Amino acid sequence: VTDEILHASCVAVEGQGLLILGPAGSGKSSLALRLISLGAALVSDDLTRVTRSGDRLVASCPNPDLQGLIEARGLGILRAPKVESAELSLAIDMGQIERERLPTFRTVTILGSPLSLVLHPQNDHFPDALMLYLRHGRQA
């Protein structure tokens, strides 16, 4: 299998894709909205196609009619800055809580390829920290 549609949202920051995983109601679209307000571009909301190309994982919107559209509860479907696709560099699982102050490096395997993974840290600054992570990487 070289592609799969996941129940996930995805944004891109300077070409770095963030796959936002988690169960329904876990805040995937809310996090995507916050990151877009901080300068990210929307790849897809709610459903994301992930394609493996060699050792790269590339995310895109599975329905071209939904590109650049995101649900904001209580407001409706909003237009957002968008990109057609992005190479994934990080995933966050909104359904799992990070309890460590300095967590170990984790990965999730998608289509046989490892992808760096972080868990939901449940603090007010984590969207800002994710933006830095995507722009500049993680040291420790």
Task: Please state what every model-predicted region is.
Residues 1-11:
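Pre-Walker A adenine-sensing motif
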Residues 2-4, 43, 85, 100-101:
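Short solvent-exposed loop/turn micro-motifs enriched in small/polar/acidic residues
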Residues 8-10, 47, 105:
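Short, acidic/polar N-cap/turn motifs at the starts of alpha helices
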Residues 11, 15-36:
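Glycine-rich phosphate-binding P-loop
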Residues 14-15, 51-56, 111:
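Short acidic-glycine loop/turn motifs at beta-strand connectors
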Residues 37, 41-96:
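Conserved nucleotide-sensing/catalytic segment adjacent to the nucleotide-binding pocket
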Residues 84-140:
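Conserved NTP phosphate-binding and transfer environment spanning the P-loop NTPase/kinase superfamily
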